[in-house]
A protein has these predicted regions:
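Outer-membrane beta-barrel channel domains
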Residues: 1-230
């Protein structure tokens, strides 16, 4: 894809367009539920530690109640960020038990300072010499997996992954909005999630921790009292 103002077939934008998205996806082949090679997006659990599936905020949490919590989607969007690149697969081990594995390595745009990444850029814009100088200057690696068990109305799962950058993250924590931004080059996260779905009651949640050493949790509940009130 080409954004407005970006050079066409020149200044490092090429061979024709600035951004391409490619993938190969196989679904429903024996025990293999999903195999995606190339660029893809993931959503695990409630998305507390892993969600680049374009759903954020409180409303998305409520709208996702009762839905499949482990999703691999091919990245076919023109959006040149917020995706993984590599391979992801979900296999049914036995009835009700699925195992998902994923690995990703990709270049990222960033603002660098003193040998570190001060800001990760997600606009995907490469129009000027300044923006081109920030293109693909660092790389990100991610590998992990998910185990999910479903029986009747009950679902439980666990997710874990390791994430690293080629250069350390060095945000300016003096800025209020970056006060809690991560610092360093290697991180890990792990979580457990659950859901119970019945015709009237839906309960869903996820609790996580990581290399930051703190615990986070998100939980939601919906109850249908009548056709007009819930």
């Amino acid at each position: 894809s080409k954004d407005a103002g970006e050079p066409f077939m020149s200044q490092g934008n090429g061979p024709v367009y600035d951004f391409y998205s490619f993938y190969l996806q196989i679904r429903g082949w024996g025990r293999l539920k999903n195999l995606t090679l190339g660029r893809y997006r993931l959503h695990e659990g409630m998305g507390l530690i892993l969600n680049n599936d374009f759903s954020f905020g409180k409303l998305s949490t409520l709208s996702a109640l009762g839905r499949n919590s482990n999703v691999i989607r091919a990245h076919s969007s023109r959006y040149a960020a917020n995706y993984l690149q590599g391979a992801a697969a979900t296999v049914t081990v036995v009835r009700g038990l699925d195992v998902t594995g994923f690995v990703s390595y990709r270049k990222i745009d960033a603002t660098l300072k003193d040998g570190g990444i001060q800001t990760i850029l997600t606009s995907g814009l490469h129009r000027t010499a300044s923006e081109m100088a920030k293109k693909d200057v660092a790389s990100a690696f991610l590998a992990g997996g998910n185990v999910s068990y479903r029986r009747g109305a009950l679902h439980v799962g666990a997710t874990g992954f390791y994430n690293s950058f080629s250069l350390p993250l060095t945000p300016n924590r003096k800025l209020l909005y970056k006060r809690f931004a991560p610092v360093g080059s290697a991180f890990w996260n792990a979580s457990v999630d659950y859901s119970y779905v019945s015709p009237r009651l839906v309960v869903q949640g996820e609790t996580a921790t990581g290399s930051c050493g703190v615990v986070a949790t998100v939980n939601a509940m919906s109850y249908v009292f009548s056709n007009r009130f819930s």
